[in-house]
Amino acid sequence: MSSILIAVIAISALALVFGLILGFASIKFKVESDPIVDQIDSILPQTQCGQCGYPGCKPYAEAIANGDTINKCPPGGQATIEKLADLMGVDIPSSAHDEEKSIKKIAFIHEDMCIGCTKCIQACPVDAIVGGTKALHTVIEAECTGCDLCVAPCPTDCIEMIPVNTTPDNWKWDLNTIPVVNLPADKPTKASEL
């Protein structure tokens, strides 16, 4: 047998043994988590932006399960608050309605002032900023959650949060408020009778 074949067989055998050990250990030493925390975490948007005051979505989910308020996630918006209220069986906080009326903002980089330091890229939790070292940076509008975390690290203050104008392209229809009426097919009905 050649030495290469022996080495391949030995490494394959070691990989198989270590894989079996890891598989056994993952079953034997599995840590059970709270299922309500997992459900809450699946509702949150997973931007890990920290606007809620927690270092990520999982710690905020744990805090909600322990009784914290459900309206601290700006990227999730009103839809997330409603889903969390339904899951937790609580009323929607009144401040959540005020936050929904606020205008959504996104980051805008004044490229003539940008020095390409990449500090904003490192701060962005959703990778909405593109650019390279010593190159101009720009924000991908569709990806930006408006978390404002990129503004503080910028040494030249070239990033500002600007309001997003509502257009037909970014309009969010609330389909639950559109009335749906079932009409019988055999009886013609006038629109005024609805």
From Swiss-Prot:
Q: Name one GO biological process term.
A: electron transport chain
Ranges where the 4Fe-4S domain occurs: 32-90
Location of the region described as Hydrophobic in the Swiss-Prot/TrEMBL record: 1-26
Q: Which PROSITE patterns match?
A: 4FE4S, 4FE4S_FER_1, 4FE4S_FER_2
Q: Name one GO molecular function term.
A: 4 iron, 4 sulfur cluster binding
This entry's comment on the bound cofactor is: Binds 3 [4Fe-4S] clusters.
The UniProt keywords, alphabetically, are: 4Fe-4S, Cell inner membrane, Cell membrane, Electron transport, Iron, Iron-sulfur, Membrane, Metal-binding, Repeat, Translocase, Transport
Keyword Chaperone appears in the UniProt entry: no
Question: Major location, coarse class?
Answer: membrane
| EC number(s) recorded for this UniProt protein | 7.-.-.-
Q: What Pfam families does this protein's entry cite?
A: Fer4_21, FeS
Which residues are [4Fe-4S] cluster 3-binding? C124, C144, C147, C150
Domain named 4Fe-4S ferredoxin-type is located at: 105-134, 135-164
Its cellular-component GO annotations read: plasma membrane
Q: Which cofactor names does the annotation list?
A: [4Fe-4S] cluster
The record's section on InterPro entries has: 4Fe-4S_dom, 4Fe4S_Fe-S-bd, 4Fe4S_Fe_S_CS, Elect_transpt_cplx_RnfB/RsxB, RnfB/RsxB_Proteobac, RnfB_subfamily
Where [4Fe-4S] cluster 2 binds, per the record, is at: C114, C117, C120, C154
Give compartment(s).
Cell inner membrane
Q: What does this protein do?
A: Part of a membrane-bound complex that couples electron transfer with translocation of ions across the membrane.
**Quaternary structure, from the entry:** The complex is composed of six subunits: RnfA, RnfB, RnfC, RnfD, RnfE and RnfG.
Question: Into which family does the record put it?
Answer: Belongs to the 4Fe4S bacterial-type ferredoxin family. RnfB subfamily.
Q: What is this protein called?
A: Ion-translocating oxidoreductase complex subunit B
**Species name:** Aliivibrio salmonicida (strain LFI1238)
